[in-house]
């Protein structure tokens, strides 16, 4: 017997027994059920996280970044469509323009406000720690300054930085992001600044290089430029690696050119603990700079920090964000963690 039918008949029998008993028993008052409060989601969840992070955020820049969550808008649900390989994503409007046969091969993906702000990478407020690091090394940003995020991953932190008055550019190769952030208001003016989103390989594609432009006060890359992804020193599955499509010298020259004189570049990588030698290699566990000190220097940069450890601060942040209590994928932030950053500067 199907489970639904069993449940239906059980419920019916229970109702009949209750009806018979009710005629012989005095009426009783059933206390109302307590409905638990809905868990904050989307922009509200980020505002809640900001309150938790504020007491451990050390810089004015970080505090302003958290406070800007008050300006994050609510976002209406939207639907994306992807092919079976997930190499191509379409907006609802783009999918509607396809032939019936093409549309039938697509899978729909429902995007709520939480997915809009977090995509598949979790809270964008994890950027607050890199901002604290930058401030501790003397970085100051003025309204109108340009900020570039290489491999931005989600739009939330870009909007927060734009709310502070910065002109922010995010570049990424993930085809989902192009479709996800294609509605009016996803980019453009935001607060006192602006958000520009570019989809394509930087610096391999000259058109993307031209669109990125120059004059940046800050270039930041979080969890993308890892040695394990780009120059693994152990065998790794090629599908988990990143091919920048150019020599290291050419890549570093392109980053150098984006910065204004005196501009700063930060690589900040939060990783699981480095894979032991007797275990299969996990590329994203090696968060060291993919570029050597000699390569940075040859490109013209001044190296301020190379593979500096930052575990304690991120452990604290991770607990406040609940990474260790995630019901689907709890992270052992006490033991299974590595955090490294590299900070370089273009001479003024």
Q: Predicted segment positions?
A:
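Conserved alpha-helix/loop element of class I SAM-dependent methyltransferases that forms part
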Residues: 121-144
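Conserved beta-strand signature within the Rossmann-like core of class I S-adenosyl-L-methionine
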Residues: 262-269
């Amino acid at each position: 017997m199907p489970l639904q039918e069993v449940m239906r008949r059980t419920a019916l029998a229970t109702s009949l027994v209750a009806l018979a008993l009710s005629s012989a028993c005095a009426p009783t008052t059933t206390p109302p059920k307590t409905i638990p409060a809905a868990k904050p989601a989307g922009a509200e969840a980020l505002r809640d996280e900001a309150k938790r992070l504020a007491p451990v955020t050390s810089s004015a820049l970080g505090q302003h970044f958290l406070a800007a969550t008050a300006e994050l808008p609510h976002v209406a649900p939207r639907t994306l469509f992807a092919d079976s390989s997930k190499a191509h994503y379409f907006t609802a409007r783009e999918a509607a323009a396809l032939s019936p046969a093409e549309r039938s091969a697509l899978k729909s993906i429902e995007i709520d406000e939480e997915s809009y702000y977090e995509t598949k990478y979790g809270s964008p407020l994890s950027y607050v720690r890199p901002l604290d690091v930058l401030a501790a090394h003397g970085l100051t940003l003025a309204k109108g300054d340009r900020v570039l995020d290489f491999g931005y991953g989600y739009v939330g932190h870009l909007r927060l930085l734009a709310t502070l008055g910065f002109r922010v550019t995010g570049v990424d190769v993930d085809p989902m992001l192009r479709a996800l952030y294609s509605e009016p208001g996803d980019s453009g003016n935001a607060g006192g600044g602006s958000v520009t989103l570019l989809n394509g390989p930087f610096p391999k594609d000259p058109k993307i290089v031209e669109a990125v432009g120059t004059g940046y006060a800050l270039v930041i890359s979080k969890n993308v430029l890892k040695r394990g992804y780009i120059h693994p020193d152990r065998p790794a599955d090629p599908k988990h690696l990143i091919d920048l499509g150019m020599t290291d010298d050419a890549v570093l020259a392109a980053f150098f050119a984006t910065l204004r004189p005196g501009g700063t570049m930060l690589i900040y990588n939060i990783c699981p603990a480095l894979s032991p030698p007797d275990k299969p290699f996990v590329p994203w566990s090696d968060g060291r700079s993919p570029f050597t000190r000699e390569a940075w220097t040859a490109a013209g940069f001044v190296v301020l920090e190379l593979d500096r450890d930052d575990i304690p601060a991120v452990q604290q942040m991770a607990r406040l964000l609940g990474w260790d209590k995630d019901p689907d994928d709890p992270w052992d932030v006490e033991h299974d963690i590595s955090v490294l950053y590299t900070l370089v500067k273009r001479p003024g």
